Structures are given as C-alpha cells and as structure tokens.
Amino acid sequence: APFQVVERLSAPPDGWIKKEKAAPSAQIQFRLGLPQQNSEQLEQLALNIATPGHELYRKHLKRDEIKALVRPLASVSEKVLAWLRDEGVPEDRIHDDGAWIKFTVPVSTAEKLLNTEFFVFHNERTGAEQIRTLEYSVPQDIHSLVKFIQPTTHFSSLGPQVRRVVPLDVLPKLRITLEDCNKKITPDCLKQLYKIGDYVAPEDPRNRIGISGYLEQFARYADFEEFLESYAPDRTDANFTVVSINGGRNDQNSTLDSTEASLDIDYAVTLSYKTQAVYYTTAGRGPLVPDESQPDPNEVSNEPYMEQLQFLLDLPDEELPTVLTTSYGENEQSLPGSYADETCNMFRLLGMRGVSVIFSSGDWGTGIVCKANDGSERIKFDPVYPASCPYVTSVGGTTGVNPERAVEFSSGGFSDRFPRPKYQDEAVRSYLTKLGDHWKGLYNESGRAFPDVAAQADNFVVRDQGQWVSVGGTSASAPVFAAIIANVNAELLKAGKPPLGFLNPWLYGLKGRGFTDVVHGGSTGCPGTVPWTGLPAGHVPYASWNATEGWDPVTGLGTPLYDELVKAALGK
C-alpha cells in the first residue's frame, strides 16, 4: 500500500541542528498511540468530576475503569500489530499496552517501517543529541489507526525552570520576620505569607505528594537533612521516598547539578509535613544495549514525560499520589501537536483518578524565541507546555512581600494549541476586555490562558551539594502551591471526603476567595536574542503582561491562602 504522512515538521525546533545520519544499528524504542474510543465523553466526564455542584463532583474513577474507557477497539490493535509482524518486527520486541503499542527496532528497520530517514540532531543549549526525523509515514490502510509514533518528530527540550542560582554566605539561623522575606525566602516566610502556620497533616496512607524528577537530577538525603536542621528544626524527622521509573537513578554521590531536585524536595516536603512525599525519578531509558555508535542511548531516545505518565496511570489506586508537582516545561510550538494532545489527555486521566497535577508556568515571561516555527517567521509570544494544557494547574511567580508583585520572568499567556476551557471564560474575558488591542496579533485570544495561580518564585534558600544557594524560578512556586493543596487534601480525607483531583473548575469557581490578588509588577520577554545561544530571535519592544485586578497572565488568580482554601474545600 502507498504511504501517507502522519506528521511533518518544516524545520527542527529552535536550537536543534541536524547532523549526520543515524547509525543503522542504533536501537530505538517507539511508542505508537492508537485512537481511543469515547474521547468526547471522556472530556465531559473529566469536567463533571471536577465541577463543584455536579452530582459526579470528586467521584474519582478507579484505574481499571479508566483503562476500560480508553481501550481502543480490539480490531484496531490487531490490525496495527499485524502490520508490525508482517514487517518483520520480532514478537518479543512488541508490547501491547492497550492504548499504546511499544516496539523496539534498529534505525534501519524503523526507516523502512516509517518511510523516512533518521538523523542525529544536536541541541546547542544543552549539548544533548537525539536521533529524530522531521517527518514519518505509515501505509495508507492503517493511517487512520495511528495517532502518533514517537520518538520521531518530538525533540525533547525539557528544561528545569530554575533561573538564578547564587551561592550564599553562611546564613544565620533565626526566627524570620516577614520583612526579611523581601531578601530571602525560607519555609517560615511561606508559612506566614500563605497562612499555613504550623499546620501538621494527619499521617494518612491515602495522601501522598509526588515530586517529578527528570534529567538525572538527584534528590540528596544529606542536603535535605542539613536544610531541615537550619530552616525547619521542628521537622527534622521529615522524609521522602524515591521511586525509580524506567531505570531512573537517585545517585547520592553524583557531582551533577541537582538544584532543581533539592529545591522541590526542600519546600514540598517541609510545607506538607507528615504527608508522604515521593520523588519519582524518571530516566526515560529504553531497553537498549549501548554500542560504539550510540554509547549512551539514554540521552538519545528518551521520552520522559510519557514514561512517567504511563507509569502513574498504571499504579494501583492506593499508590497514586493525590498531588503531583513538576517544574519543567518547553516552548509549546516545539512539540508535535499529536504529542501535546496525547500527554494533555494523560494529565486529564490523572485528574479523573483524583490527582491534582501542578506545573510551574515557565521562566520566560512573554517568551524568548518569539517567532513562529511554521516557516512564516511571524513574531509572536511563546506559550509554554505543559503549563498550557487545560487539565493541569499552572503556577506563575511572585516576589517581595507586603505587597507581593509579579516576578518579571513568570511565564504566562495563551495557548496556540488548546482552546480556552469554559471554567476560565469569565475570568479571562474580563482581562481581555481591559487589555483591548494591546499586543493584538501576538497571542491567540481564544486559547487556554495560563498561569492559573502563583506563589513566591525568587530568592529561595536551598541546600545543594553541601552548599547554601539562593534559587529563583517558577520551579519554586509549583512545589509551594502543591504542598498547600496536599494540606487541603489531608483535611478533606480526615473529614471523610475525597481529595480535590483536577483543581481548575473549583479554583476559578471560588471567584477570588482563598487568594490574594496580585496587582503589582508584570512580566518581560522577547528580547530579540536567545540568551543561551546568542542567536537572533523575535523582538517585541517592551513586551510584557501586567499583573492587574482579577486574573492575569503573570500571576493567574493570585497567591494562595491556606486557611481560606481549606474552609472553602470543606464547604464552610
């Protein structure tokens, strides 16, 4: 049968350079997504479960109920499996996982299967190399049965959202007044600012805060213990467990940078004290044997967020976290559309199972690249994914106290891929009315707007590799907000009620209750060059989103007040 293109990129995403052809013997593990049944019903069901007042509100689904809902028709799986077998893919290299089929083949076979050529691409910013292609096809008779096959056109530019890391002189161990929090942020600052006080969650096996680790970032126990001794001396018995996904390591002696992991653990665990904390370390490694041509396959063909999402969706109900916080993201346009859709669907399924999925919004303000990659070179603002997925809660950044103001690097804006969900219509329309024609044409005014909320994101004191450092980035705000939600869940479970799950319809429905509206400051961006490569990029003079009354694309609905949110959740 003739081939039909599944996906095509006009050029590699920003920062990636095409190099030599991939070695024919290099093994790649592919994941093929099949069309799911019931996709429209699923969307409605997810919203019903998350909408206060609906009869299904917080009636979360079990793992096996979700699996049954998303399983493709048997005839579909059978036809795709038959194609792989006919093309000579060995049976023991094929794994049928319901919604996905995984298969591992050398590049030479993959090129025949997908009618394409694979090349090595080099990322100028990170030095990473990946085997990818700019387009791939499948035979016409199965084209409608294949949603996507990855890794092909997805260039993983995962970046942790850490901006500034500054070594600190020895820090005094004092009780901190709120005034000191203008200079540095510690757990005490956040406990005062967000009205958490000395709250201690009841120990409950059903409540778990999950922290995502990627890119060989390791959470070190020694650093964590020293952090507790200095900044949470009443909580020195706090702890976390490590769960390895797909061969992820948690190397206690690594000399690699691990500021991201330290930041997430230090604050998520200290602020949700007594809730079980789990660090999920994901390597995204295929079952590959290194050879000369590809000495470290892990760098080349990893798909860490799909690996992590699939692992979590496969967990038994009693092992699932009730909150998952993740501090990384990438330019939305650098992802193949089908990949963004699929991972966003997986976040939605986690929400339906009762997980509050929380992401940092990004550290690029209105954007860095600020130029369309579809060949048009049109100047535009850059939305960040996964923050732009309507099924995650995206957290922007603030700085300073009395009053808090938007931090200039806090990413926000409007998705070019996902339409604006109804739950945020009212809040976002009111902002767009105030904005008028300002920045018209640089953003998609009908897109999903983000962030949803905000929290402190600069000058955090962190212990990393035996040193005190000050860290900034929306990486810091996501675990803080997640810890507050974990505490709300602890109180709900104690009262015999289910946890919050997907948060956004509830958060927007509070109409400002439980939040401090941030009205000072704004973001910046689109400087005209990419800082880490020096290459030219889209330039928008004075590019900015302002923090204003009500929702805005820098601080969302504002910063959380735990004492009010817990009352609202309990219906008081």
Where are the regions that the model predicts?
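Short, glycine-/polar-rich solvent-exposed loops and beta-turns at beta-strand/coil boundaries
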Residues: H95-D97
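Substrate-binding/charge-relay-adjacent region of secreted/lumenal peptidase catalytic domains
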Residues: P2-R93, K102-F103, V107-S394, Y423-S470, ...
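Active-site-proximal alpha-helical segments within enzyme catalytic domains
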Residues: A476-N489
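Polar, glycine-rich mid-to-C-terminal structural blocks
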Residues: P390, S394-S430
